[in-house]
Amino acid sequence: MVSLAKRVDRDVMPVSLASGRTLPNVTPIMQAIGTSGFIVAENGGMVWDSIQGHGIRSLSDGSRARKAAEWLATKIEGLDPRGIESNRWRETEWCLSNTDSFEQMKSLIADSEWSDLEVVSTGFAVHIANPGLDKSLGLSIAMDQRGIDPKRVIACGDAPNDIPMFDLVGFSVAVSDLYPEVVASADAITEERGKSGSIELLKALLGQ
């Protein structure tokens, strides 16, 4: 997949990464791929375009999200407020590993002093963030820095946190059918799923 991404970046269009992972997690992946795009991390909360010489931009303060997680731990038995290990590097949101309790978390937050916060599950973790903080925000800033029209961008994803990104770009591709709402928001879905679906998309962009 890395070699395909490099070829797309060289011959078709710049390849960027937009992820729910932290910047320290995404950066080495981007470096390993070696493409000319930018990074959007923490579901839109962190933007870094080192290729174009732009500094790291942190778009939110995750302290309220962390306090909300600590409060949730007093309401849900067995919930660890420390969340996933990468929270140690998280600046703009807070992530909890108890995905089975997602609906309960969402309901509790909705009736609390943190009702303005967004609660989104990616299947891997439950992300708690300030309102309006999503991939479309970070991507809009990153694209604006480069003078890119979002409608000339293709994006792929597989989880609910990708929906704002799908709504922003000109063409969106779902590489999983696990979430019906993700499939419904996408312009197309790959025949293969997951990593194989991403490879299918890259090959299609290369005309293979």
What are these regions (language model features)?
Residues 168, 172-208:
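Asp-based, Mg2+/Mn2+-dependent phosphohydrolase catalytic module
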Residues 27-31, 52-53, 107, 167-168, ...:
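Short amphipathic alpha-helical segments
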Residues 1-87:
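Active-site phosphate-binding/coordination module
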Residues 68-168, 177:
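Conserved acidic, metal-coordinating active-site core of Asp-based
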Residues 11-16, 36-37, 151-152, 168-171, ...:
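Short active-site oxyanion
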Residues 33-35, 43, 113-115, 168-169, ...:
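Short, structured coil segments at secondary-structure junctions
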Residues 25-28, 104, 138, 164-165, ...:
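Phosphate- and divalent-cation-binding pockets in alpha/beta enzyme and binding domains
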